């Protein structure tokens, strides 16, 4: 996921280093509040190692002890911190409970856990809240094709694990835009000639 995030940002001519990245979901599975053995922990640790600035939102998790107490949790010398460089700043990572606040001015959003509130997110509202086009990463098929298409229409870059058809959707959106511009230019040319 960290590499997909890097690639999506790169496609938008933005570096991952110092990018504000929001991870949606900290728990190990949907609609529960347990972070033990969460795949999101590995995503956060790898992104931190790559230089990203991180935010996390999870409606079911008030504290992420694997980070807040990373030197002693689950026990001394057994934290996943030991496998990654530059993990010290993650001890200050806190889970944001307010989704709108978490989305504000981020460069990338990673849909990491299939929580019900994330399934209901509207792409237009997400992009408006973030302040413009973002990189959108789908870890578990959370986004349907209509939402993926809408993110592309809004100028976002979308990547997904096991979502090979995303490129086809992107190409369709690009083709629709090109057709629209051709029609607009044709109408403008006709108006100019008719004057």
Task: State each model region's role.
Residues 1-195:
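Structural/interface elements that position substrates and couple domains in central-metabolism enzymes
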